[in-house]
UniProtKB/Swiss-Prot annotation:
The organism of origin for this protein: Prunus persica (Peach)
GO terms for biological process, alphabetical: auxin-activated signaling pathway
Function: Probable receptor for the plant growth-promoting hormone auxin.
SUPFAM superfamilies with a match to the protein in the record: RmlC-like cupins
Record's protein name: Auxin-binding protein ABP20
Organism ancestry: Eukaryota, Viridiplantae, Streptophyta, Embryophyta, Tracheophyta
Amino acid sequence: MPQATMIFPILFTFFLLLSSSNAAVQDFCVADLAAPEGPAGFSCKKPASVKVNDFVFSGLGIAGNTSNIIKAAVTPAFVAQFPGVNGLGISIARLDLAVGGVVPFHTHPGASEVLIVAQGTICAGFVASDNTPYLQTLEKGDIMVFPQGLLHFQVNGGEAPALAFASFGSASPGLQILDFALFKNDLPTEVIAQTTFLDAAQIKKLKGVLGGTN
């Protein structure tokens, strides 16, 4: 009986190692975008239906449309756009910032981010969980890392358009923009006022700008 008790955890661990990652047992797991996405990502396409185009994404050479309220555009090459990264723990995106452009405070719940500036000047930073801010003005060629789940931002700090590329440690890093979470939905004004100490008039103004109600 003691021997059987010892064998069971060993077998269980062995089973977990075999089943924990498609990448551990096959070369790749191209996402089957026709299937639903689960907590572990998309299921794999059958190898016979995989094409070279599944491993190629051509959208990062095209400037995004910055004619919007934040004067910024993000072109993602996440698993939904680039099925070849499924299961590999990587993805990338292009960031265009017009003069005065800003990516408001946001988080990526599923991944850390590395930002490299390709053109212009970008003021970027994040706030640690102890509320310490870390800010830096980045020039062409500079790189900054944003740890997973922490609030961070990017602002065009120059007098010309800025361009950057961001890589992520997940095929689907997720995104939540703080301003949108507060003011671009039907979260009641009184609740926001109680939890942020903003006055109702300011909240309604921000809801009006961002398309929220209540």
